[in-house]
Amino acid sequence: MNSIWAVVPAAGSGRRLGGEIPKQYREIAGAPLMEHTLRALLESPDIRGIVVALDPSDRRADAIDSLADVRVQTTPGGAERADSVMAGLELLATEGAEEDWVLVHDAARPCLPLESLTALIERARRSGEGVILAEPVADTLKQVGEDGQISGTVDRQSLWRAQTPQLFPLFA
């Protein structure tokens, strides 16, 4: 593993959340969610640089102080999350090396402890394979038939909730 880059898709409108302000710009603890997210990534000495994929018509990005950090660059994002991730990967393809890795982390997920990020990176280094953060499913899950009636309880023993960041070889 050579360098680790981060791609932060941030072009979304947050339709599911609703409201006038996209969720990455909603404030908690005095700063937009994306500001907290970028600070968490910038805190890691393992991350060489960050590409933030923004909506080309975004007028709120000026509120994100971390975008001015020399390790952060922006690129136009797309209509969907996958489009924004691809835009970030395409930019990195021109700068990254064959041995580089990329970490994808959502702009509106600010609660990323440095310890979790470091453990994720160490696991990738040891295994040489892509890794994700995940946690066991704790909620009871029900299976429902076509008639809308509960037909059973799902065994959660092997079920995990995928989270971000997700870390993979850049040129995989």
Regions found by a protein language model. Give the residues of each.
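Conserved N-terminal catalytic core of the sugar/cofactor nucleotidyltransferase
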Residues: 33-99
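Short aromatic/hydrophobic "clamp" motif used to bind/position activated sugar donors
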Residues: 102-103
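N-terminal glycine-rich phosphate-binding loop and ensuing alpha1 helix
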Residues: 1-57
